[in-house]
Amino acid sequence: MKKHKFYITCKHGKDIEVMQREGEILEYTAPNGTILQIGVAKDDTYGVYSLTEISTGCLIPVKGYKYKKLVLKQLTPDLLTQIVQALELARNKKVASVLKKYKDGRKIKNDM
């Protein structure tokens, strides 16, 4: 799959590199190694583009625009960092709940 690079310009510091795969998926690798996949979708009802984090299916809080370029310009380094942090928190909660269920299940079996 062919990837195209584009950069998000920061006011302070260097630009953030984001890869765009063929189609409408963007990939961003955070400094901690977390890979963020963002889907660009056009709403058929209103005819505007929106952004979605693919692994969770959550909409990214940006204003919908008729042009894809205007939606992508709203991706800032701060927003990407917040999305990565929220994604890590959601994953940690999910892992903790699975571990708790597993631990509770073993405890019940051992008591019998």
Language-model-detected regions and their locations in the chain:
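Negatively charged, low-complexity tracts enriched in Asp/Glu with abundant Ser/Thr
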Residues: 1-33
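Short intrinsically disordered terminal tails
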Residues: 1-4, 103-112
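Non-catalytic tandem-repeat scaffold regions and their flanking low-complexity/translocation tails
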Residues: 22-25, 39-41, 92-99, 104-105
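Acidic, low-complexity, intrinsically disordered interaction modules
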Residues: 34-81
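Acidic, low-complexity intrinsically disordered segments
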Residues: 79, 83, 87-91
